[in-house]
């Protein structure tokens, strides 16, 4: 998480900052959703192949092992290392990422509405803005 204070010369400048981040996040989300769709198809195919192999191994008598279970290793409190993820495991992580990006977009849109109110009154004052993950959380107006 990035946290900081940034100075903006006006509400208009802050709006441009928010709009730039919204544009970037929407592009990232669009790219990610395309990857997720591809992974969904791979995951479904992987699931059908595993079901077929399971059925065949029961009929043939000799067991087969897929050998592709992902190993998840915790590297500290907030970092995981996933070794050899199946498409469904990778899909789960990427869907979580897409949800996080979507929530950030919603927060930025809400912040933008608030800043628009400042811009509408023609406020021409310096703004010190507390940003948490590039989302404005507090604005100090300085005359």
Go through each PLM region and give its residues:
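Residue-identity detector for glycine
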Residues: 4, 30, 60-63, 67, ...
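Short, charge-rich amphipathic alpha-helices with coiled-coil/heptad character
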Residues: 1-30, 82
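Charged/polar, solvent-exposed surface patches and flexible loops
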Residues: 16, 20, 24-27, 31-34, ...
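Short, glycine/alanine-rich amphipathic alpha-helical segment
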Residues: 69-93
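Extended alpha-helical coiled-coil "stalk/arm" regions
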Residues: 28-72
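Coiled-coil termination/hinge junctions
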Residues: 45-55, 89-138, 143
